Amino acid sequence: MGTVHRRLSDRAWDGVAAQPYDDAPGGVERHELIGRADGAPHYRVRYFHVPAGSRTALERHAHDHGVVIERGRARVTLGDDEHEVGAGDVVYVAGDELHCFEALGDEPLGFICVAPPA
């Protein structure tokens, strides 16, 4: 059976708790919007909130994932390359690719990430 999580504010959804992203500096939050708890065995959809001036951890995973920038601007590291992106831009992160999302400017960064379950 499907699930609906209604958006309550710019970074809150009904029935979805914010989770600290311990590997990242500066108060980054994750929100699992769709996952195993919702009956989704093959993928998960998460929202990341990155405060202005902060970033996600520089990391790599075996799986690939897709990212949609929802708000703010970011410097995205993909392997040895860096790209500036903004709201509406889409990023593909290949499996085992070193990556990081850094909020630029005075506005927080918000993005949706779709990936296989951990």
Residue ranges of model-derived segments:
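A short, N-terminal "cap"/entry segment at the start of jelly-roll beta-barrel domains
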Residues: 1-42
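Conserved short histidine dyad/triad with adjacent acidic residue
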Residues: 30-32, 46-61, 95
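Short, surface-exposed secondary-structure edge patches
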Residues: 47, 66, 81-83
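A short hydrophobic beta-strand segment most commonly corresponding to one strand
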Residues: 47, 92, 106-118
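A generic "binding-loop/recognition-motif" signal
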Residues: 54, 62-63, 81, 97, ...
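Histidine-centered metal-chelating micro-motifs
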Residues: 54-57, 75, 91, 95-101
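Glycine- and acidic-residue-biased ligand/ion/polar-headgroup-sensing regions
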Residues: 63-74
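Short acidic-glycine-tyrosine-enriched beta hairpin
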Residues: 81-95
